[in-house]
Each structure stands twice: as structure tokens, then as C-alpha cells.
């Protein structure tokens, strides 16, 4: 039975782990790092780069480099956060069936497709590490993600070729990784501040149970926003001095973004750092340089209101759980942004407890997801996760009112029903508008979907009985059904969130992903073949220059001819790997005499001995053959 991959699909970085040897174990990517930048880039040559290679070229290719895609997962273009994303992101955020998507070189990609490319990279690197195929995963999401965002995350996994066994909340996952389920019963706060999202969750843990009591947060608050405060400050200072707005220059903005992120990280350990960007722009007077010192105190003043927003959320969630700060036994810090000293100090001062920072905040969520994978596979016994729905769910009723069917904080999975009736005499159909949120009026809440139950027999208003059922599975994904109790007619909608993707579109994307996988594999093989050919040419030409006097002219001519053949082949436009391999093989074969000449010069006695032993060389048994490479 294959291993389940635990994935923390982050805004800034992603991480993966498996359950091995009775514990979660982080898997490094092919670059040897425990985290992979959640960045995807499209090059002018048609290549798709993911992770570190994509991040490295972002400065020179800002409009085709996608980062922070998690910020627009499941987001509608009509939402304020979409408008904010359009202002902040250097790539084009466009409308696709009402949902946010990105446009690269006249092609539109959904956030699910971009996220799938990150997941594919993680999947491939995990398979290389484990030496076996990985087809199942547990993926984490912020506790405050709504239905649309959860569904979009699951769709991304499907497109990447993963069977997503479970979507679980990041704080719950962190609690598992910290082993808090093994302690005596106590109430804890998980404070999770990542690159783009913030969650705070109160859990009751102990006796192998992790139960969510209350959760809150902001799906659009994190380290990216801290970076943006530095960017805004530096750009404003630069404009005041030079009269040039750097935010209108996408390449300058990308350089400033990288510098701001580095400055933020450095200020976690230093009291002051410098943003130094030579030749950031130019005008009629010549090139301009951005050189600014920023102190930790200045940085803290820039982000103080953002930190206070997180403190207010802690207060709200503790009260929502019916608790006081004195009831909290432990505070667990999760997410890279919790490394900021001011964040740690404010949380510690507010709750009045020392912070638990015993696990790497960048890795803890993926570790917990791997443990949950072990639970689902039966490798981990007696652990029970009791997650809750973060927002109330209901339908629109007469007068545009939101009538709640499942209240916020209800433990999932859950199934609840309510009976409704018609608003008019002889009403033949009812429209069910599914809503998520805490406001009293339907228009102030998020619409998750709409469907119609028709064929209701003629009857006075208030007589027909329409049973509406809300069913939330363990992933937090919702199915809503409506049934006319008189006729037994029913209609249901599996809420696809506002992802804007139909099942057929997801299926097409899965096939496209497989298709690109083959293309990518061919492209990679071609690059490797070219590299091998270049290396062989270099070594052969170098050796020929050194040892040509020890070769007969006919042998030298053969080698030179094979070198030229390979060089000409590499210049061809529509080159195949087979053509390269053929010419490489030819050059390798004619170069044998050159190798003999080299060996003879270096070790003449051994060469003579070798000549004498040639007759016996073919008599070695297969068992004696050692296949190895020497560096």
C-alpha cells in the first residue's frame, strides 16, 4: 500500500511529509530544501518552472511569474479582495466564469491549474525520494477557508493526479504534529500566521482527541502584507526624492518585492538592515538607485495595525469558545511570519503564556497532514480529529433573509435538515440559494450556489413541505438537497464553491496535465542529451589537442569528423534526442583510440600489462563486473 503524502500548500512556500517509522517525516525537494516556493513561471521558450527555479527568474520575468496564487483560490471577481489582488500582483488577474483566474501570454489559467503545477512538483519529488508512486494525499487549508476555497484546493489536487483523501484545517494539523493529542486534556490556542493567510483556533486536546472549539482568521492577511508595507514605504520615499513611482514599473516592483521580503527576514534577527537596489530605474537625468536603511522599530511601526488585527481575532475566538484567557494552557506558533519578534511578543503579552515554538513553524503543518494520512490508512490508531465548520450555512428565505441551517462552530461531518414551504399560492417551483456567513440578510453573505426544485403540486401558500438538507463531509465540503415531501421529488447540488470549474473542465485539466507531463519529460530528456553532448565535445576536443601527436592521421581525422558531425547536429532546428544519441555514440566509438593514447602516456607499464591481458578480459564472470562511476 502506497504512502499518503501530507501537503501544506502554502501561499509563499509549500512543504510535504510522509508517515514513516511511527512519526511524520519531512521530505526534501530535489533541490535539497524542506520547503518549496509556491511559485510557477512561464518562460519565453515555453518551459514551465516551479519552485526555486521559478522564484530565481522572477525579477526578469515578473508578468509571467505567478506567486501567492492561494490568495485568489475560490475567489470571485466581484469580491473586494479580487480588486486588491489586481492592484498588488504584477501578473494579470482576469474574470473566468465570474471567478478569479490569471492570464499568461493570452492563455487563461485557473488558480487550481497553477496550484496543481506546484502539487505535481511536490508529488514528483516525493516519488523520487520514496522510490515509489504517490497517488494519495492529505492537503491542509486555513481553518477560515470557505467552501469555495476548500473545493478549489481539492480540485487542484485532482488535476495534479492526486486522490485527495482529506482536506484538513492547518491548526488541527499543527496540533497533531506537536503531539498535543497525547497530553492530558487541556485547551490550547494555535496561532497560525503564514505568507498569505492567518488563522487562530482554540482546540481541546488530550486522550487521543483533537477537538476544535472555535476558529477565526483572515484568508487575506500574512507575510505578504508585511512585505507590502515595506514596499509602500520604500516606494513612497523614493518617489518623494526622485518623482518616480516605482509601482508603475513591474520589473522594479518585483525587485522591490524581493528586497522587502529579505529585509523582513533579516529584521527578525538584526536591529537594522539596508535595501540596496542599484539601477532600479532611470529618467532623463540618468540611472536611479534605491538605497534605504530600515530599522526593526520602523518595520514594527509599519505593521503594527496588522499585528493588532490578529490579536483582536485571538480575543474573539477565545470568547467564541466560551473561555477566558486564563483557561488557555498553551499557545502554539505556526507559520513563517511567527518568527517576527513583535508578533511573538504581542501574542505572549496578550494571552500571558510562554509560546510553544518547539517545532519548525514552516514544517509543522505538513507533518500533521502526514500523521492524518497515517490515521486514514490505519497506521495511526486511536486518534480522533473533530473539526468544525468556520462559518454558518443556510438559505435565502422570504424577504431576503438568511435562515441558518448549520451554525458556525458545528463539529463536522454533520447532516441537518429543516422544512420550508412556498411563499405564494400554487407556486410550482422553489429556488434554493445556498449561503455562507454570519449576516442577517442574504445579500451580505457569500452565495455558494443556487438550484431549483420544480414540479410542486398546486396548493395554497404554506401547505407544501419542502425538506432542505445540508450535508458536510469530513473535508468540510457541502452538499445541499431539497425534497418535496408530498411527491418525493428531490433535487440536490454538490456545492462546487465559486471555483468556476465543471467536472468536465477538471477532467480536461487532468488530461492536459498528463499531456504536459509527457512533454516536460521529453524536453528534460532533450536537455540532458544536449548537456551530455556538450560535455563530450568539450572533453574530446581538450584531449585531442593534448594527445593528437600520439594518434595516426586517419584516427585523428575520424575523431575530428565525428566532432564536426555532432556540432552540426546540435545546430539543427527540429532536433530529436535520437539524432543526438546517434552522433554521441559515433564520437564515443571513434574516441577509443584517443583514450588509449591518454592512458598509455599516463601509465605506460600498466598499458603494456593491459595489452597482455586483453585475451583474458572476456573470460570474467558477470558476477565480477562492477558497474560504477568515478568522479
Swiss-Prot record:
It holds the Pfam family HSP70. SUPFAM superfamilies: Actin-like ATPase domain, Heat shock protein 70kD (HSP70), C-terminal subdomain, Heat shock protein 70kD (HSP70), peptide-binding domain. GO terms for molecular function: ATP binding; ATP-dependent protein folding chaperone; unfolded protein binding. Gene3D superfamilies: 1.20.1270.10, 3.30.420.40, Actin, Chain A, domain 4, Substrate Binding Domain Of DNAk, Chain A, domain 1. The keyword Nucleotide-binding applies. Induction: By stress conditions e.g. heat shock. The modification Phosphothreonine is found at residue 197. Keywords: ATP-binding, Chaperone, Nucleotide-binding, Phosphoprotein, Stress response. InterPro entries: ATPase_NBD, Chaperone_DnaK, Heat_shock_70_CS, HSP70_C_sf, HSP70_peptide-bd_sf, Hsp_70_fam. Coiled coil: none annotated. Residues 600-631 are annotated as: Disordered. It comes from the Bacteria. PANTHER family: HEAT SHOCK PROTEIN 70KDA (PTHR19375). Acts as a chaperone. Belongs to the heat shock protein 70 family. This is Chaperone protein DnaK.
Amino acid at each position: 500500500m502506497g504512502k499518503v503524502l501530507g501537503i501544506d500548500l502554502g501561499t509563499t512556500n509549500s512543504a510535504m511529509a510522509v508517515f514513516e517509522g511511527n512519526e511524520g517525516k519531512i521530505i526534501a525537494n530535489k533541490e535539497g530544501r524542506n520547503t518549496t516556493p509556491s511559485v510557477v513561471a512561464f518562460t519565453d521558450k515555453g518551459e514551465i518552472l516551479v519552485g526555486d527555479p521559478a522564484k530565481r527568474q522572477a525579477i526578469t520575468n515578473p508578468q509571467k511569474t505567478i506567486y501567492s496564487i492561494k490568495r485568489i483560490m475560490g475567489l470571485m471577481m466581484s469580491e473586494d479582495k479580487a480588486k486588491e489582488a489586481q492592484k498588488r500582483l504584477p501578473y494579470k488577474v482576469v474574470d473566468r466564469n465570474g471567478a478569479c483566474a490569471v492570464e499568461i501570454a493570452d492563455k487563461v489559467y485557473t488558480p487550481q491549474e497553477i496550484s496543481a503545477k506546484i502539487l505535481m512538483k511536490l508529488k514528483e519529488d516525493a516519488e523520487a525520494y520514496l522510490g515509489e508512486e504517490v497517488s494519495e494525499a492529505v492537503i491542509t487549508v486555513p481553518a477560515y477557508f470557505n467552501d469555495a476555497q476548500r473545493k478549489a484546493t481539492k480540485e487542484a489536487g485532482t488535476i495534479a493526479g492526486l486522490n485527495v483523501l482529506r482536506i484538513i484545517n492547518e491548526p488541527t494539523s499543527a496540533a497533531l504534529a506537536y503531539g498535543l493529542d497525547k497530553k492530558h486534556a487541556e485547551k490550547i490556542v494555535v496561532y497560525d500566521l503564514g505568507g498569505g493567510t492567518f488563522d487562530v483556533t482554540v482546540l481541546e486536546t488530550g486522550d487521543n482527541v483533537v477537538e476544535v472549539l472555535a476558529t477565526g482568521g483572515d484568508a487575506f492577511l500574512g507575510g505578504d502584507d508585511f512585505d507590502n508595507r515595506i514596499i509602500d514605504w520604500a516606494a513612497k520615499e523614493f518617489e518623494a526624492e526622485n518623482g518616480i513611482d516605482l509601482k508603475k514599473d513591474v520589473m522594479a516592483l518585483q525587485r522591490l518585492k524581493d528586497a522587502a521580503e529579505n529585509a523582513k527576514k533579516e529584521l527578525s534577527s538584526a536591529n537594522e538592515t539596508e535595501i540596496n537596489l542599484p539601477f532600479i530605474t532611470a529618467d532623463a537625468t540618468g540611472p536611479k538607485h534605491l538605497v534605504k536603511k530600515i530599522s526593526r522599530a520602523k518595520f514594527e511601526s509599519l505593521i503594527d495595525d496588522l499585528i493588532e488585527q490578529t490579536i483582536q481575532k485571538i480575543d474573539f475566538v477565545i470568547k467564541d469558545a466560551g473561555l477566558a484567557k486564563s483557561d488557555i494552557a498553551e499557545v502554539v506558533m505556526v507559520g513563517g511570519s511567527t518568527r517576527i519578534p513583535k508578533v511573538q511578543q504581542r501574542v505572549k503579552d496578550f494571552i500571558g503564556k510562554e509560546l510553544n515554538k518547539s517545532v519548525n513553524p514552516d514544517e509543522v503543518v505538513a507533518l500533521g497532514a502526514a500523521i492524518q494520512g497515517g490515521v486514514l490508512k490505519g497506521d495511526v490508531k486511536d486518534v480522533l480529529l473533530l473539526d468544525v465548520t468556520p462559518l454558518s450555512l443556510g438559505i435565502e428565505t422570504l424577504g431576503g433573509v438568511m435562515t441558518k441551517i448549520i451554525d458556525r462552530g458545528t463539529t463536522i461531518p454533520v447532516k441537518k435538515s429543516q422544512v420550508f414551504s412556498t411563499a405564494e399560492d400554487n407556486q410550482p417551483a422553489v429556488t434554493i440559494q445556498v449561503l455562507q456567513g454570519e449576516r442577517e440578510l442574504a445579500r451580505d453573505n457569500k452565495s455558494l450556489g443556487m438550484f431549483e426544485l420544480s414540479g410542486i403540486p398546486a396548493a395554497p401558500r404554506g401547505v407544501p413541505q419542502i425538506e432542505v438538507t445540508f450535508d458536510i463531509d469530513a473535508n468540510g465540503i457541502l452538499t445541499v438537497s431539497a425534497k418535496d415531501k408530498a411527491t418525493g421529488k428531490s433535487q440536490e447540488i454538490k456545492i462546487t464553491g465559486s471555483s468556476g470549474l465543471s467536472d468536465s473542465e477538471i477532467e480536461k485539466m487532468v488530461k492536459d496535465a498528463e499531456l504536459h507531463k509527457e512533454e516536460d519529460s521529453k524536453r528534460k530528456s532533450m536537455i540532458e542529451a544536449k548537456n551530455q553532448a556538450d560535455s563530450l565535445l568539450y572533453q574530446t576536443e581538450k584531449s585531442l589537442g593534448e594527445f593528437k601527436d600520439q594518434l595516426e592521421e586517419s584516427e585523428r581525422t575520424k575523431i575530428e569528423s565525428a566532432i564536426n558531425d555532432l556540432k552540426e547536429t546540435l545546430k539543427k532546428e527540429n532536433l530529436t534526442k535520437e539524432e543526438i544519441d546517434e552522433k554521441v555514440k559515433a564520437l564515443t566509438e571513434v574516441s577509443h583510440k584517443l583514450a588509449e593514447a591518454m592512458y598509455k602516456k599516463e601509465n605506460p607499464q600498466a598499458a603494456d600489462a593491459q595489452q597482455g591481458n586483453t585475451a583474458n578480459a572476456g573470460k570474467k564472470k558477470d558476477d565480477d563486473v562492477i558497474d560504477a562511476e568515478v568522479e
